[in-house]
Design a protein with these regions (language model features):
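RNA pseudouridine synthases
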Residues: 1-185
Length: 185
């Protein structure tokens, strides 16, 4: 198995991965060119000064169109960690929801657990949605947008969705993703 860290180190031993995505989540990652910059970005993440937005396709739909979800999640050491996630339902087709998530904390599997709690697990999530009719699908969770200020300059990046994600959107008759309004904070 080759990891993102392995790929980055093959390009330059100075490069550092600043944060992580859950396995099988697609989308944006920040890679620093050196340890000094990695530490700066680490502090920005800890201070919640980097805004992350995810897009997910989920089986079912949440009861509310938009809300904050506060959850206690066990970490790998069985310690409870508090999480906060804002979500907005963007569209529903054939009982499949297109949901935008903004995690205000960054814990392992946070969005996947939140989705399950909302009653609409992410398509392709075999860990938290093992009885789905979509078990053979790739995980439909994408780190879609990153926004931050660095050296007094605003930065914003958008991810392209994978072919598989786009094909699924088309198959279930979702409109072009650019038509949906992103949550502003």
């Amino acid at each position: 198995n080759i990891s993102i860290d392995d790929i980055i180190k093959s390009i330059s031993s100075d490069y550092r991965l600043v944060h992580r995505l859950d396995k099988d989540t697609s989308g944006l990652l920040i890679v620093a060119k050196n340890l000094y910059t990695a530490k700066i970005f680490g502090k920005l993440f800890k201070s919640s000064l980097i805004q992350k937005t995810y897009i997910a396709l989920c089986e079912g739909q949440p009861k509310q169109k938009e809300s904050d979800v506060l959850l206690d999640i066990k970490n790998k050491k069985d310690k409870i960690e508090k999480t906060k996630t804002h979500y907005k339902l963007l569209a529903v087709q054939n009982n499949i929801s297109l949901i935008q998530y903004k995690p205000l904390t960054g814990k392992t599997h946070q969005l996947r657990i939140v989705s399950k709690k909302l009653g609409c697990s992410i398509i392709g999530d075999n860990k938290y949605n093992s009885h789905s009719k979509f078990n053979n699908e790739e995980l439909k969770l994408n780190a879609f947008n990153l926004k931050f200020i660095f050296k007094d300059k605003n930065y914003e990046f958008f991810s392209e969705l994978s072919k598989d994600f786009n094909d699924f959107l088309k198959k279930y008759k979702f409109k072009d993703l650019k038509r949906y309004t992103l949550v502003k904070f």
